[in-house]
């Protein structure tokens, strides 16, 4: 579980709600019609903008913020070194059925065992990365739509409230409360976009970039094995993807 994501999102919500309570209670900040305009209105617009599978799938994608896939770069380097040594000793066929960390690595290894040449191997795996990025970007686009449309729907709700307020100016005492209700939709739109969806989008983009880096590292290692390069050379090439601290730790091991 991504503790930072959970603490950050929960902490931001607690701070906002806490300030409302401190200012006099949550009740003045709750208005059901305003919530419907912002949340339901934004949801329907996002649905209109995106294909149904993407709209339904992006909710599941957002849950990955709290439980993302983890990619251990050190593990994949160590595994690649072992496979390289085995391939140089017993041949490529000796790699068949060997345990690897994930499905992408397994597919690449199977292509290698099946005798796929280096160029075709790289092309196929690069296509896999391209397809993955397209899926991720589709879901991220749906999340971004919430960020873009939410505040706009908040403004729409505020304008509706102002029209209703200005249409009933006979009672001056009602103007203040009516104005407050009108402004709530703007508040809801800003909170939804910046407190909830913006951090989620940023996390998803980061996780996607990490997965691309991991997969490119796998390709680099498999390419080295296909070329018959030494395990040391493959390791030196792959270690470049690690940060300085991890490089030093691996060198000392």
From Swiss-Prot:
- Extract the InterPro entries matched here: Flag_MotA_CS, MotA-like, MotA_ExbB_proton_chnl
In its keyword annotation, does this UniProt entry include Transmembrane helix? yes
Sorted keywords for this record are: Cell inner membrane, Cell membrane, Chemotaxis, Flagellar rotation, Hydrogen ion transport, Ion transport, Membrane, Transmembrane, Transmembrane helix, Transport
**One GO CC annotation:** plasma membrane
Any idea where this protein resides?
Cell inner membrane
Topology Cytoplasmic: residue spans: 202-253
The transmembrane segments are 3-23, 29-49, 146-166, 181-201
Q: How does it sit in the membrane?
A: Multi-pass membrane protein
Biological process terms from the Gene Ontology for this record are: bacterial-type flagellum-dependent swarming motility; chemotaxis; proton transmembrane transport
Q: What's the family?
A: Belongs to the MotA family.
Report the protein's function: MotA and MotB comprise the stator element of the flagellar motor complex. Required for rotation of the flagellar motor. Probable transmembrane proton channel.
Self-association state and partner proteins as the record states? Each stator complex is composed of 4 MotA and 2 MotB subunits. 2 A subunits and 1 B subunit are thought to form a single ion channel, so that each stator complex contains two channels.
Q: What is this protein called?
A: Motility protein A
């Amino acid at each position: 579980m991504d503790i930072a994501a959970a603490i950050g999102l929960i902490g931001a919500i607690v701070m906002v709600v806490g300030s409302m309570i401190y200012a006099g209670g949550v009740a003045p900040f709750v208005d059901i019609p305003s919530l419907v305009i912002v949340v339901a209105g934004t949801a329907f617009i996002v649905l209109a903008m995106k294909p149904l599978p993407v709209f339904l799938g992006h909710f599941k994608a957002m849950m990955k913020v709290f439980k993302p896939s983890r990619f251990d770069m050190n593990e994949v380097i160590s595994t690649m070194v072992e496979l390289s040594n085995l391939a140089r000793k017993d041949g490529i066929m000796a790699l068949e059925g060997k345990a690897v960390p994930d499905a992408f690595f397994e597919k690449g290894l199977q292509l290698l065992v099946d005798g796929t040449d280096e160029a075709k191997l790289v092309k196929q795996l690069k296509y896999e990365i391209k397809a993955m990025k397209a899926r991720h970007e589709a879901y991220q686009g749906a999340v971004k739509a919430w960020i873009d449309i939410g505040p706009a729907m908040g403004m729409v709700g505020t304008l509706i409230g102002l029209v209703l307020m200005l249409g009933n100016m006979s009672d001056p005492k009602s103007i203040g409360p009516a104005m407050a209700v009108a402004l709530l939709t703007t508040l809801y739109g800003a909170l939804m976009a910046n407190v909830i969806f913006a951090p989620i989008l940023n996390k998803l983009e980061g996780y996607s970039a990490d997965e691309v880096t991991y997969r490119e590292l796998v390709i680099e290692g498999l390419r080295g094995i296909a070329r018959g390069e030494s395990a040391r050379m493959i390791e030196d090439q792959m270690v470049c993807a690690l940060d300085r601290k991890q490089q030093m730790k691996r060198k000392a091991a």
